[in-house]
Each structure stands twice: as structure tokens, then as C-alpha cells.
Design a protein with these regions (language model features):
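C-terminal amphipathic alpha-helical segment
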Residues: 10-83
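Short acidic-glycine-tyrosine-enriched beta hairpin
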Residues: 100-120
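Short, glycine-/Ser/Thr-/acidic-enriched flexible segments
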Residues: 7, 65, 76, 86, ...
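Conserved hydrophobic/aromatic beta-strand scaffold that supports enzyme active sites
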Residues: 1, 47, 68-70, 88, ...
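Ligand-binding loop in jelly-roll beta-barrel domains
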Residues: 1-8, 105, 118-137
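Well-ordered beta-strand positions
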Residues: 72, 90, 107, 115, ...
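Glycine- and acidic-residue-biased ligand/ion/polar-headgroup-sensing regions
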Residues: 73-102, 111
């Protein structure tokens, strides 16, 4: 799930769970309806993959809050997490090694997700994998 940061949670269904007091937890249906946007989303035009030299990038979605790309790494991808945003990578298929200067390398496989903090700087994915890459704008 990709969303704007918020410290508010409205519970609209709770699967019959109960709180520490043994009673059903409070639902927030009216508040959830008040903040729900029921307008259909505008479809984002699909782009063609862009060859980045050793990997490709295809834009899935972009809005004022975040950008989502699918990347396909054939050999290696040199990337960067600058001070303006974290980068999140979710491996869809294959496997790769995430490395950055001064940090231990991390092996990633299908289903793994890694949060790369803002300001980490340059990092590299090496291997052969497909992944969803998200950052805020």
C-alpha cells in the first residue's frame, strides 16, 4: 500500500476482534466515509520501458505525492536515495544484492521489501530481478 503519511486510522471493519477489555473495538464508519474520495482515479498513461544501461525502468504511476516505477535489472542498477526521499524496493521476481558504501550487502529475493532511508546516497542492485521502486516527490 502506498499512501500519504498519516497518524490517523479509521477502523471500518475489525473481523470480530476484541480489545484488551474483551469488548469489540470501536469502529469509525462515519469518519471514514467523510474522508473517502469516491471519485474514480484518472488512469495514468503507461510508459514504455526506458533502457538505463544494465536495467530498465517503466513508470507505473506518478502524482504530487509519490512516483512508482517497475525496474528490471539485467546486470546492475546504480541508484540513489537523496535527502529528499526514501526509496522502497519490492522484489517481484528473481533476486539481487543491494550494496552501498559503508554498509553490509543484503541479498534480496522474490517477495522481499527493503526501505532505503533518505540521504543514504548511492546504492546498487546487482543480479537479475524485477522490482517495484517507490519514492516520494
Amino acid at each position: 500500500e502506498i499512501q500519504q503519511n498519516s497518524n490517523t486510522t479509521y477502523r471500518i471493519y475489525d473481523y470480530g476482534r476484541v480489545g484488551a477489555d474483551g469488548k469489540p473495538r470501536q469502529l469509525h464508519i462515519d469518519k471514514a466515509v467523510d474522508v473517502t474520495n469516491l471519485c474514480p482515479a484518472k488512469p495514468y498513461p503507461q510508459s514504455e520501458p526506458v533502457d538505463m544501461g544494465g536495467w530498465t525502468k517503466k513508470r507505473l504511476a506518478k502524482c504530487e505525492y509519490f512516483t512508482v516505477d517497475v525496474i528490471n535489472v539485467d546486470t546492475s542498477a546504480a541508484l540513489e536515495a537523496d535527502k529528499s526521499s526514501f526509496v522502497n524496493i519490492l522484489v517481484l521476481d528473481g533476486g539481487c544484492v543491494l550494496s552501498s558504501e559503508g554498509n553490509d550487502a543484503v541479498e534480496l529475493k522474490k517477495g522481499d521489501s527493503v526501505f532505503i532511508p533518505a540521504g543514504l546516497g548511492k546504492f546498487e542492485l546487482t543480479g537479475k530481478c524485477s522490482a517495484v521502486m517507490t519514492h516520494i516527490d
